[in-house]
Amino acid sequence: MNSAGRVHRSRAGSRGHAAISPLTMASFSVARGIRSSNVYDDTDDELSILTFFSAVRRNRLTSSLPPILSARCSSACFSVRIVLPLSLTISISALMYSTNSALGRKLTGAFSIQTNIEQSCGFFRTSIMATLPPIECPIIIGPPLVFNSCFVIKCFTSSDMTS
């Protein structure tokens, strides 16, 4: 990641190396706290299959990541972008993850985050880079191991904090 908070991606050397972590980014847009859009970008489909779903209820954006299909040690990186009109402000009060794996492990806690706020064309664009810790799984021969995991990202607008 460079100083502006952007991630440089490269596919070079990504094939055939178990140590390479999949990098998947999703952008979520919230307009006036009542609508959302979802952008899916899988940058390394060889290592994992990741899909995002998003929903907004009472200005709360929740994104869930369904089961990860992987036969290698893996980690994932998510970029959450929230765009609001200048008349609204955003307050990040929680950015959490929770998993339940098929191996019996349960991980909960806060993401490590870096926030970059820009003002453009009457909107604030708040980009949050959230990085999950690695999810370790055994190197196996045969079908990929399916993790029964769900990551939840919660972002709150300022109006949600006062309601």
Swiss-Prot record:
GO aspect biological process, one term: cell wall organization
Main location: membrane
Transmembrane spans: 76-96
Induction description: Expression is dependent upon the presence of the cell wall integrity pathway mitogen-activated protein kinase SLT2 and its downstream transcription factor RLM1.
Disruption phenotype: Hypersensitive to cell wall-perturbing agent calcofluor white (CFW) at 37 degrees Celsius. A similar phenotype is observed at 30 degrees Celsius, although the severity is decreased. Decreased expression of genes contributing to cell wall organization during vegetative growth.
Membrane-topology descriptor: Single-pass membrane protein
Coiled-coil annotated residue ranges, if any: none
CC terms in the record's Gene Ontology section: cell periphery; plasma membrane
Subcellular location: Membrane
Function (record text): Involved in yeast cell wall biogenesis.
Protein name: Protein NAG1
Organism expressing this protein natively: Saccharomyces cerevisiae (strain ATCC 204508 / S288c)
Gene responsible for this protein: NAG1
